[in-house]
A protein has these predicted regions:
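Short, small-residue-biased leader/transition segments that mark boundaries at the very start
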Residues: 1-7
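Conserved "repeat-terminator" motif of extracellular CCP/Sushi domains
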Residues: 3, 51-72
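Extracellular modular ligand-binding repeats in secreted and cell-surface proteins
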Residues: 8-37, 58-60
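Short strand-edge motifs at loop-to-beta-strand transitions and within beta-strands
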Residues: 15, 52-56, 62, 148-157
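Surface-exposed coil/turn segments at beta-strand junctions on protein surfaces, enriched
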Residues: 20, 49, 57-59, 87, ...
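Surface-exposed interfaces of beta-sheet-rich extracellular modules
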Residues: 23-52, 164-166
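Append "Rare intracellular matches occur via the same short Y/T/C beta-strand/loop motifs
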Residues: 25-30, 61-69, 169-173
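Short, surface-exposed linear motifs at loops/turns and structural transition points
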Residues: 70-195
Length: 195
């Protein structure tokens, strides 16, 4: 399996690297032009890292973009989560990538993936719920997670199956803010159909 990784800088220059799935890639932001400063990296247009260098594991074709803002602009850092579902060799792979700002006085508690098959997802939609850890509309929920204190990491879970269905998943990260309140942030929905 090979994959394309595209990174671009402020001047519109795009660099494409061809990598193997599973390779680790490091991107470093170009020097900001006068009057600008580096803000963050996005993966497929979602903020994922606020450091000028970002190392990640390639899991599919992705676009990694450096974002620059005006020098005087305050950078608004946010918690972000991405999710991907794939299938190979009789196993569904759920992958969640998350990033929690290190300077926001947050404490990371747990990260993982919540998933269900097409039967479970239909039940969730029927009662107009969302796929979350608190979903009550189906017993077909798969909740995977690990207690962690990492601010930028991947979480991967495999499920052995060959049944024809569509798997739906959302990555999540749970953190505690500086007032002691816990929050869980979810990715957009990812899905993969086994045929």
């Amino acid at each position: 399996w090979s994959s394309d990784v595209c990174s671009s800088d402020l001047n519109g220059n795009t660099e494409t690297k061809y990598c193997e799935v599973g390779d680790q890639v490091r991107v470093v932001a170009a020097q900001a032009p006068e009057g600008k400063k580096f803000s963050h990296w996005t993966v497929n247009e979602k903020p994922i890292c606020y450091n000028e260098s970002y190392t990640f594991t390639v899991y599919k074709d992705i676009a990694v973009t450096s974002v620059y803002v005006e020098e005087a602009e305050e950078i608004q850092k946010e918690v972000s989560v991405l999710c991907d579902v794939s299938y190979a060799n009789g196993r569904v792979k759920f992958l969640s990538k998350y990033s929690v700002p290190t300077d926001a006085d947050y404490k990371v508690i747990k990260a993982g993936v919540v998933a269900t098959d097409s039967t479970g997802y239909a039940a969730i939609q029927e009662v107009q719920q969302e796929l979350t850890l608190d979903t009550t509309a189906t017993t077909r929920l798969k909740k995977y997670g690990v207690n962690t204190d990492l601010y930028l990491a991947n979480f991967t879970q495999y499920l052995k199956t060959s049944r024809t269905t569509t798997w739906y998943a959302r990555g999540y990260v749970t953190y505690q803010d500086n007032s002691g309140e816990q929050h869980t942030v979810y990715s957009d929905m990812a899905q993969y159909t086994i045929r």
